[in-house]
Every structure is written in structure tokens, then in C-alpha cells.
A protein has these predicted regions:
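Active-site neighborhood of phospho(di)ester-bond hydrolases with catalytic His/Asp-centered motifs
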Residues: 5-7, 30-35, 58-63, 88-92, ...
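Binuclear metal-dependent phosphoesterase catalytic core
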Residues: 199-201, 205-225, 233-279
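Charged helix-capping and loop-helix junction motifs
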Residues: 44-48, 73-77, 205-213
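A basic- and aromatic-enriched beta-loop-alpha substructure that forms the phosphate/nucleotide-
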Residues: 58-65, 70-126
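Active-site-proximal loop/helix segment associated with metal-binding centers of metalloenzymes
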Residues: 103-186, 193-202
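Beta-strand-turn-beta hairpins that frame and shape the catalytic cleft
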Residues: 1-4, 94-104, 239-244
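Active-site environment of divalent metal-dependent phosphoester hydrolases
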Residues: 10-16, 38-42, 64-74, 94-97, ...
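N-terminal active-site segment of His-dependent metallophosphoesterases
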Residues: 1-60, 66-74, 152, 159, ...
Length: 279
């Protein structure tokens, strides 16, 4: 099966102004690792209008897709408007088509990855510093809500919720990969899963812990054929253990070249995993 890999489309009205259309390659399925736009309504509309007429779409939402909503409300909206369509949402859930299995979730983060000068500190202290800096600079904590009807709470997202959701997703992915499957196993997350995916332009920054967590133990133990992620605005294609890790983000207009390949299509068959690119 030919799978088009893409993430971080960040669709906006400026795309039309700057003649930045999305090029649709020839493929059997689109694997989209989130951040389609800056709210869930526009994101789902974009997929229905631009990609789903050409091929099925399997996606997980990115952090930007939750902006202006709570995580649960955005997921509820996305499930409602993708049910029975050519767009298939994954959040701690699995999609199967022919010999391809895709296990997906946003993933979020545990704030524990080491890519900074505080790597020598105990993990609790390291996490505290990463959370402190991330809350200062990340829009997630200003634009994603935290709603708990039982407590009457309507506030903004807290790092603790990200961490809880991360570990829930981590356990789900681990469990699903442990189930027998004859064919290709692919994991799809928005957040990154290794230091190797981090953008070298931001090497050493404490806030890298908000972009990636270290899931290499699961990768090496469970051996999925592919792990697709987004969130990092830098093309990545490397092998971790027996797993090919891929990230193909379009990114923002102002960022310039980040290695994005408009027609990045891979062969998912276990017997034939050579890449084909239309651009």
C-alpha cells in the first residue's frame, strides 16, 4: 500500500494569498500526524475538502488542532464529523485496512526527555524545570482549555493533564503492539518519540521536553515497522532498532526550508518497503 506521510500543514487563509496550495500525490492512503490548522473545526473541514476526496485519511490531532477548545471537546467534535467518512481519527485507537495496522494517539509528553544542560539532575527536578519553561513559552497553556463538568472547572490546560494523557497513550500503544498482527504495524503520534527527531536549531533548549518523549524502549521491544510523528518542524527519516521513524512537516510559511517533501509516499508492505516520492 502506498502511504502519503504528512503533518503540520498549518492551513490558513494566507496559503491562498501566497499561492501555497497543498500538492496531493498519488497514494492509497494519507497518514496525517496532526496540526492541520489552529482549531478542530477548520482542521476537519480541510481534510474533508482537500484530501479525503482523493484517498482515505488516517489522522491523529496535534496540539494546535485543540486550540480554542478542551481536549475532550475537540475529540468529540472530530469523532462526530468523521464518523462514516473517508477520514479516520485515532486517539488511543487502531485502524486496520488490508495488511496495514495503524495505532494512533496525540501522545502529548512526559516532560522528561534529556536534551539540555540539566540532564544530570534527578528526573523529578528535570521535569519541574521543563514544565516551568514550557508554561512560559508554549501557547498550549493559553489556548487549550481544561474542562471538568463534575468539578465545575473551566480553566486552561495544565501540564499534569498532558502527562496523564501521555502515559495513558503510551500504555495503549504498548498494549496494541503486543497483539498479534499479520502485516505492517505503524504507530501514528503527533508528538515525537526520540531525541533523534529534535530540531538541531533548538539543541539544548529545556522546552524540547514539550516536543518529544523517549519511547525508544517500546520501539526496540515491540518493533513496529513504522512510527510516524509530527510536531517537530524538520523532516526526519531514520531507523531506531528495527523501526523506521518518519516526520514530514509542511510547517509555517515564514519558516522557509525544513526539508518538507510534498509528495513523500512510502510503500507500507513488509515485503517491499522502498520509498517513492512524487515531489
Amino acid at each position: 500500500m502506498k502511504a502519503w506521510i504528512i503533518s503540520d500543514i498549518h492551513s490558513s487563509r494566507l496559503d491562498l494569498l501566497h499561492r501555497r496550495p497543498l500538492i496531493i500525490p498519488r497514494a492509497d492512503i494519507c497518514i496525517c500526524a496532526g496540526d492541520i490548522s489552529d482549531n478542530v473545526e477548520r482542521s476537519i473541514d480541510f481534510l474533508h475538502n482537500e484530501i479525503a476526496p482523493h484517498m482515505p485519511v488516517v489522522l491523529t490531532l496535534g496540539n494546535h488542532d485543540y486550540y480554542g477548545s478542551s481536549i475532550d471537546s475537540a475529540l468529540e467534535y472530530a469523532r462526530k464529523w468523521t464518523a462514516g467518512t473517508n477520514v479516520h481519527l485515532l486517539e488511543n485507537s487502531t485502524f486496520e485496512k488490508n495488511d496495514l495496522r495503524v495505532i494512533g494517539s496525540t501522545l502529548w509528553t512526559d516532560f522528561e526527555i534529556v536534551d539540555h544542560e540539566y540532564g544530570h539532575l534527578p528526573v523529578d527536578e528535570r521535569r519541574r524545570l521543563a514544565i516551568q519553561e514550557s508554561m512560559r513559552y508554549l501557547l498550549d497553556f493559553r489556548l487549550i482549555h481544561r474542562v471538568d463538568p463534575l468539578l465545575g472547572v473551566d480553566s486552561l490546560l495544565e501540564p499534569d493533564e498532558m502527562i496523564i494523557r501521555h502515559w495513558d497513550s503510551r500504555a495503549f500503544i504498548d498494549g496494541e503492539l503486543g497483539k498479534p498482527f499479520t502485516g505492517t504495524s505503524m504507530v501514528l503520534t503527533h508528538h515525537a518519540i526520540s531525541r533523534r527527531s529534535l530540531d538541531p536549531r533548538f539543541a539544548g533548549q529545556v522546552t524540547n521536553a514539550a516536543f518529544a518523549s523517549d519511547l525508544t524502549e517500546i520501539i526496540r521491544r515491540r518493533k513496529p515497522h513504522f512510527w510516524i510523528h509530527g510536531h517537530i518542524h524538520r523532516h526526519a527519516d531514520y531507523v531506531e532498532g528495527d523501526t523506521r521513524v518518519l516526520c514530514n512537516p509542511r510547517g509555517y510559511l515564514h519558516e522557509g526550508s525544513n526539508g518538507f517533501r510534498p509528495g513523500f509516499v512510502i510503500e507500507t508492505s513488509v515485503a517491499d518497503t522502498e520509498e517513492r516520492s512524487d515531489g
